[in-house]
């Protein structure tokens, strides 16, 4: 999907567009010395990254929900969700160069978001309403992490690729969970994987 169609689809206002453009420009500049995104994806950045992340807003209806972005990297999707007006986004990544980048973005754009430089399993186990992740780990590992911060009402949304069915099959060996698969709006044949009610099989 082209940039102008993405702007129209999500009804982005002038301020949101300017903030996203600033964010994208900073990623591309920073990417010259620190790997934030694959170089091959930069030319089609709005479809591959912006659209891929913004589509999560179609599933997260309340702006005040507590959101955990596991392994945020460049702030994808956490920064973009914050730009859309989600007010309680916590982003986690273990790589300081990446979290330093995101800290500066949060400051420059005056976003209501937080970033921590920690391994996911080391942050305080405060339950979250929504858990999101993109390009972090196979589903079995994501569920291991998500279970630490989930309650009966928590919903997770993982941006996944073509191999999602195999990942679900592998995860079913260790976990019981409810899931739905939604086709991604972005190019590349990916999907949005919705997960609820995670339990280990020996519970």
Labelled PLM ranges:
Residues 1-62, 68, 97-112:
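Class I SAM-dependent transferase core
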Residues 54-128, 132-133:
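Conserved SAM/SAH cofactor-binding pocket of Class I
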Residues 88, 112-114, 155, 176-180:
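Conserved beta-strand segments of alpha/beta enzyme cores
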Residues 90, 163-203:
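Active-site capping/gating segments
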Residues 103-104, 143-146, 169-170:
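Short amphipathic alpha-helical segments
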Residues 135-138:
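Short glycine-rich anion-binding loops that position phosphate/pyrophosphate groups of nucleotides
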Residues 143-155:
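A short glycine-rich, Lys/Arg-flanked "PGG" loop and its adjoining helix->strand segment in the class I
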Residues 153-164:
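Conserved beta-strand signature within the Rossmann-like core of class I S-adenosyl-L-methionine
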